[in-house]
Amino acid sequence: MKPFPRAEISRHALKNNLARLHELAPSSKVMAVVKANGYGHGLLNVAQCLDNADGFGLARLEEALALRAGGVKAKLLLLEGFFRATDLVTLVEHDIETVVHHESQIEMLEQAELNKPVTVWMKVDSGMHRLGFVPDEFHQIYQRLLACDNIAKPINLMTHFACADEPDNDCTAKQIAVFEELTKDLLGDRTLANSAGALFWQQSQASWIRPGIALYGVSPVVGDLGTKHGLIPAMELVSQLIAIRDHKAGQPVGYGSHWVAEKDTKLGVVAIGYGDGYPRNAPLGTPVLINGRLAPIVGRVSMDMLTVDLGAGAKDNVGDKAVLWGKDLPVEEVAEHIGTIAYELVTKLTPRVAVCLD
């Protein structure tokens, strides 16, 4: 018997989305970003499904080690870089590449005793102002990295966009110009484009692109849908109705008696709540798909359950499937109702939600 709630992950969708990104950037290799448990889709499952990706991007060393332990042989890159000097031995042992974005990392590399140099990606702060070396110090830092015997040559180069998900914002064009001016005539691979870069900024498609959310069929742009760009949603979050109740006009439901029925209706109780990662702050009216129609959430989302208004004439039954998001109820639209972004919804699912690869 299939567990509820569960996140059903489509192999077909994942493979389609990777192929679509290859189409959009035919001259670039694809570093599939699978951090945060594959954006909630299952780290190892996603990496094994995307076995024709050219490499994988992770946030933490533990994620990279999990892929190696699972038999993944492809290029792995730590996008946040390493945190401790002791990590360097592990990087060498498991052939894991790292971003270098801060003076402290350079000092650790210079002082380390390694039996093999580490492949690094020097991060340029071209305008995001979060991580990376600012333009004024770029050439000095680059020469310092060249002089370090613990760093493999050539040095790879990267940056990250602040506003690529705003196609009409010229911030991205300025960042591209800053990066290209600094790195012209230098050797090494380059990567600029995240999902939004790959979709909307063709000039950012360098030797590598590193899509994240687009791999999972979701648009990086608020108010947009991944399906408009040939992507297929990879996750369907489902649960079931565990109770159906006749509800009289004037009666409240849920904690705080937050919602009161204006007319007689039927309410359905769905087995999912904030203990599963569904947002407690989902407002009244947030849609849930029941038997092909949208039923609005009424009352507050609780730890294990939420309640929907099925309507007075509802013919639904206990045990019927409830879709919280998926191909017929895009996660982008649910995120808009809740006032967040799809990234947050898919990555915040808790271990109580079974992740099932079809």
Swiss-Prot record:
A Gene Ontology biological process term: D-alanine biosynthetic process
GO cellular component, one term: cytosol
Domain of life of the organism encoding this protein: Bacteria
One Pfam entry name: Ala_racemase_N
Alphabetized SMART domains for the sequence: Ala_racemase_C
Record bears the keyword Transport: no
Pathway: Amino-acid biosynthesis; D-alanine biosynthesis; D-alanine from L-alanine: step 1/1
Cofactor requirement: pyridoxal 5'-phosphate
Residue positions binding substrate: 130, 303
Residues spanning the signal sequence: none
Active site per UniProt: 35 (proton acceptor), 255 (proton acceptor)
InterPro entries found in the cross-reference section: Ala_racemase, Ala_racemase/Decarboxylase_C, Ala_racemase_C, Ala_racemase_N, Ala_racemase_pyridoxalP-BS, PLP-binding_barrel
Record carries keyword Isomerase: yes
Record-linked CDD domains: PLPDE_III_AR_proteobact (cd06827)
Class of the enzyme per the UniProt entry, highest EC level: isomerase
Residues modified to N6-(pyridoxal phosphate)lysine: 35
EC number, as in UniProt: 5.1.1.1
UniProt keywords, alphabetically: Isomerase, Pyridoxal phosphate
GO MF annotations, alphabetized: alanine racemase activity; pyridoxal phosphate binding
Catalytic activity: L-alanine = D-alanine
Biological role: Catalyzes the interconversion of L-alanine and D-alanine. May also act on other amino acids.
Family (UniProt): Belongs to the alanine racemase family.
Protein name from the UniProt record: Alanine racemase
Organism in which the protein naturally occurs: Shewanella pealeana (strain ATCC 700345 / ANG-SQ1)
